[in-house]
Amino acid sequence: MSTEQVEIHEVKIEVPDKVKVSEKHRILNVEGPLGKTRKNFKKIPVDLKVESKSIVIKSLGTRKKDYAIFKTAESLVNTLIKGVQTGYTFKMKIVYAHFPITVKIKDGNIHVENFQGERAPRVSKIFGDTKVVAKGDDVVITGPVLTDVSQTAASLQQNTKVKNKDSRVFLDGIYLFEKHDGIEK
């Protein structure tokens, strides 16, 4: 049994000039040129401090599990900062064989009309500050928060899933084909 003291992990993340960061009651607010976002760190066991132009994250323990949680928190903060600076873009392709699918954006929802000849539209929610644009056979989803953009894309893809048929034959749906950092204009 070792009595050697193991070093607690700590990282200092530099905040760019165009980004403002504040923390109150373990809720991290990040504001940048593309918008603002927030992340609740109340249930994540790390020590979080905002200094002038930097964020210091410190693990609370020395075990492997504590290190994994520490690296997850670091990744979350980096994702928030990158999102308000450059944003995220997901591109989806509308695929159909017989009935032409049309996608319309109404009241913060995505309406998929004429999917497999159905009369009622299938409706998916748009999460957060995400923007959705339907151009021809492509649907472009952009936004500053990665979780909102990816959840919008996932709910749209799941909503157009073909059920009770052979998925190798009936390929109709809306599928993700590209995702990258940055918002195209």
State where each predicted segment sits.
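Ribosome-associated RNA-binding proteins
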Residues: M1-K185
